[in-house]
Amino acid sequence: MSKLIAFDQEAREGLQKGVDALADAVKVTLGPRGRNVVLDKAFGGPTVTNDGVTIARDIDLEDPFENLGAQLVKSVAIKTNDIAGDGTTTATLLAQALVNEGLRTVAAGANPIAVNRGIAKGTERVVELLRELAQPVADNAAIANVATVSSRDEKIGAMVADAFDKVGKDGVVTVEESQSIEDESIVTEGVSFDKGYLSPYFVTDQETGHAELENPLILLVREKISSLPDFLPVLEKVANSGKPLLIVAEDIEGEPLQMLVLNAIRKSLKVAAVKSPYFGDRRSAFMDDLAIVTGGTVIDSELGHKLSETTLEQLGSARRVNITKEETVLVDGAGSAEAVEERRNQIRNDIERTDSSWDKEKFEERLAKLSGGVAVIRAGGATETEVNERKLRIEDAINAARAAGQEGVIAGGGSVLVQIADEIEELSRKEEGDEGIGLRSLARALRRPAYWIADNAGLDGAVVVSKIAEQPNGSGFNAATLEYGNLLEQGIIDPVKVTHSAVVNATSVARMVLTTETAVVDKPAAPAGQAGAHAGHAHAH
């Protein structure tokens, strides 16, 4: 395929326009008075959301050079979401601000490599300061505040805090759609483990990137699955049953994996496959745990089982399975409560008998997985659009609450970044040349989230930012009440993990854009009937 190439300023301008287009669509959602964005969908009704990463994922631009810029800043939102689960709008906005500030200085003659060094140096200092300012999450009220700020809904905040209170800060909290108008929360039996889907083709919800299976059959296999003739009979039996299928095995490779992916793409069978966690004896023991929880049998050739002769009766099941890129959660396995309790007692006996502290720790981990319930929050609403929008907000709240428990919290509303910006500005005065310019560019970018939170609230962002800079640490601007005060006391708080992930990911992409000299894209195909048209009109419409 023919390529289009842009150099120097032309390449950077194309990228900048794409960055601006995507970031401008996302930043209207920032803050408690931010607006919604409506996304048109090829199937079903439109999606109404204020979730930054959902909006970013939906945007592709017609101009190929501008689209490169949009995809770069989209990666900031997606990576921040993957690491912290929230803060995607802040990350997108920071990337835009830093790209614009940096390109302005480069156009004025600054050395982009030196500017980059300054930005990198400043980013390290920002992360240090964020961690120094972090306050530990002391109680359930703090979790509720974090979840409320993330979702903009006190009821969601309270439900999320209550869910974590019931299952513990390391417990599993998941979200699903409710059959009623009201939200509801339950704690149910469940097991989670740190393995995600083997192929992204198994994803059923493109917005969240999750594979969700309702009432699936569960095939547990001790060894690798690599022979299609052995695998096909059980796959056909499941297909005839009309139920979804989850496969947990040491690995699935070659033709069997290709067959599963093909079925998923054609939607002829709703299926997902994950590797079994751990190694050796631990893997084997955990597979036995799963068999008891799901009411299934582990297919094991050493015990005389043949995969090709597996019956539906040997498969386990669960009410629901949710799989992300990194984790699998089984809710309400079909195994009997008596069998599960018997297994727990067996593990408790193993803990008492062992002299090895390492073995004891691993037994306790297994016991925790079998004992810890899964909190399920069900998103309610009058319409499918409302339910989906609420589901996204609950997911953000859950992720923010979990992040807060990991690295602590800081005052929210972008206020801490404004105050840190002043310190970075001070640092820039000690640096000579273009590294100092890079530090100043970073300082200006750090003030933009607070600026846009104020702007979305109908106020002059520049005036609000200057007033925030005068506030003591922990204080700032509350866009919900339009007042200045102690944000920590008012419960306007952000998780440190979310803010620091946003800063690190935004600066990483901005630095790439600043040092770009050439952009290469596929030449757009001419629309039908215009094959001989001028290349300038060859963009796809």
UniProtKB/Swiss-Prot annotation:
GO cellular component, one term: cytoplasm
GO biological process: protein refolding
Compartment(s) of residence: Cytoplasm
Record flagged with keyword Lipoprotein: no
GO molecular function (one): unfolded protein binding
Main EC class the enzyme belongs to: isomerase
Listed PROSITE patterns: CHAPERONINS_CPN60
Primary site of residence: cytoplasm
EC number(s) per entry: 5.6.1.7
CDD domains membership: GroEL
Key words of the record: ATP-binding, Chaperone, Cytoplasm, Isomerase, Nucleotide-binding
Domain of life: Bacteria
Reactions it catalyzes: ATP + H2O + a folded polypeptide = ADP + phosphate + an unfolded polypeptide
Binding site for ATP: T29, L30, G31, P32, D86, G87, T88, T89, T90, G413, N478, A479, A480, D494
One Pfam family cited in the UniProt record for this chain: Cpn60_TCP1
InterPro entries (alphabetical): Chaperonin_Cpn60_CS, Cpn60/GroEL, Cpn60/GroEL/TCP-1, GroEL-like_apical_dom_sf, GROEL-like_equatorial_sf, TCP-1-like_intermed_sf
Function: Together with its co-chaperonin GroES, plays an essential role in assisting protein folding. The GroEL-GroES system forms a nano-cage that allows encapsulation of the non-native substrate proteins and provides a physical environment optimized to promote and accelerate protein folding.
Quaternary structure (record): Forms a cylinder of 14 subunits composed of two heptameric rings stacked back-to-back. Interacts with the co-chaperonin GroES.
Similarity section: Belongs to the chaperonin (HSP60) family.
Protein name per the record: Chaperonin GroEL 2
Gene name as annotated: groEL2
